[in-house]
From Swiss-Prot:
Name assigned to this protein: Triplex capsid protein 1
GO molecular function annotations of the record: DNA binding
Family: Belongs to the herpesviridae TRX1 protein family.
Subunit-level organization: Interacts with TRX2, MCP and capsid vertex component 2/CVC2.
Lineage: Viruses, Duplodnaviria, Heunggongvirae, Peploviricota, Herviviricetes
BP GO terms, sorted: viral capsid assembly
Keyword set includes Membrane: no
Transcription regulation recorded as keyword: no
Function: Structural component of the T=16 icosahedral capsid. The capsid is composed of pentamers and hexamers of major capsid protein/MCP, which are linked together by heterotrimers called triplexes. These triplexes are formed by a single molecule of triplex protein 1/TRX1 and two copies of triplex protein 2/TRX2. Additionally, TRX1 is required for efficient transport of TRX2 to the nucleus, which is the site of capsid assembly.
Pfam family name, one: Herpes_VP19C
Amino acid sequence: MNSKSSARAAIVDTVEAVKKRKYISIEAGTLNNVVEKERKFLKQFLSGRENLRIAARVFTPCELLAPELENLGMLMYRFETDVDNPKILFVGLFFLCSNAFNVSACVRTALTTMYTNSMVDNVLSMINTCKYLEDKVSLFGVTSLVSCGSSCLLSCVMQGNVYDANKENIHGLTVLKEIFLEPDWEPRQHSTQYVYVVHVYKEVLSKLQYGIYVVLTSFQNEDLVVDILRQYFEKERFLFLNYLINSNTTLSYFGSVQRIGRCATEDIKSGFLQYRGITLPVIKLENIFVDLSEKKVFV
């Protein structure tokens, strides 16, 4: 038996010993408090979920949020605009998918219906002027709190579990089924899956457009993930290279990959997201542990 198994067995024995203690009902509160703290600590340890997390709170216009208003566990991006006010905006993955080439026309229409106001059109126009999406847009975190007022207050988890405000429930990550990608030769063969967001580029009607994928793989090493993605996007990479040669552009890479976090294979569920009468098929990565990494580009 290795040290980890021995430690786990010792902890289980301690928990059972705590349950059998006869003095828990003693009215003298000091000893009872010690026992209660011990029980809570061991319960947290055994559950495998870290109590500490890294999160940030920001404000963004409510007009840029739609399903994010009613659903926690939505991936958010930080957008640096080219204007002085507002200088920084925060938009969701679903918002960016409304203009991604790898999303079907039907789903793009549904997303456009969700996000309907003049500000959305202006922000999308600014995003479309970027040479690369990542030049102005960067991964920020997963929503754990949304509070609406004159502006929306967002709390986004950058590392840790996506707890709600009371830390009673753990939420997952919700992504569109159309952009969900499993490039492994034998998907879901391991108990833990790593989640990445991938941005790639393609020439559409003589114009470069971005695509977004949420990738699920059993590989943690990002260099291996890049190799798998190179093989998966072999045709798209060839067409992109042809575009670079013919357009005399200064673009230098085909795509980028960045880790979002990890989750258990058994926690990957299919479902539907509903908002204002619109229903979209989604994948829910329940109990995801967010662990954002640095972006890695590839050609």
